[in-house]
């Protein structure tokens, strides 16, 4: 991973099928990302709440925009972020 490349953040939790689908798409499109498990990371859980979300997956793009759920168009758009 290039340290100068913007990083997308993916907030997940165990047994979340949409989370796994989003992660597969990020990998498929070659989008660099880091994963935060909100079930074990209180800071990540608070960040998700602060963004206004109550469920996972939550994707936080490097430009500060975010979305929840499996939105293929939004995920594809991250390739150009």
Predicted regions and their residues:
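Structural micro-motif
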Residues: 49-59
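Short active-site oxyanion
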Residues: 7-9, 32-34, 64-65
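Short secondary-structure transition/capping segments
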Residues: 3-4, 46-49, 68-69
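Short amphipathic alpha-helix with an adjacent loop that forms part of the alpha/beta core around
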Residues: 46-51, 76-80
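Non-catalytic, surface beta->alpha helical segment in thiol-disulfide oxidoreductase systems
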Residues: 61-81
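ATP/adenylate-binding site constellation spanning eukaryotic-like Ser/Thr protein kinases
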Residues: 13, 53, 72
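Thiol-based oxidoreductase modules, predominantly thioredoxin-like and allied folds used
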Residues: 31-44, 55
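Local sequence-structure signature of Cys/Sec-based thiol-disulfide redox active-site neighborhoods
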Residues: 1-29
């Amino acid at each position: 991973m290039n340290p100068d490349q913007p990083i997308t953040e993916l907030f997940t939790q165990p047994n979340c099928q949409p989370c796994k689908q989003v992660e597969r798409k990020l990998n498929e499109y070659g989008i660099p990302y880091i994963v935060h498990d909100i079930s074990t990371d209180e800071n990540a859980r608070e960040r998700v709440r602060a963004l206004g979300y109550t469920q996972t997956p939550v994707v936080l793009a490097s430009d500060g925009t975010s979305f929840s759920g499996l939105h293929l168009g939004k995920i594809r758009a991250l390739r150009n972020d």
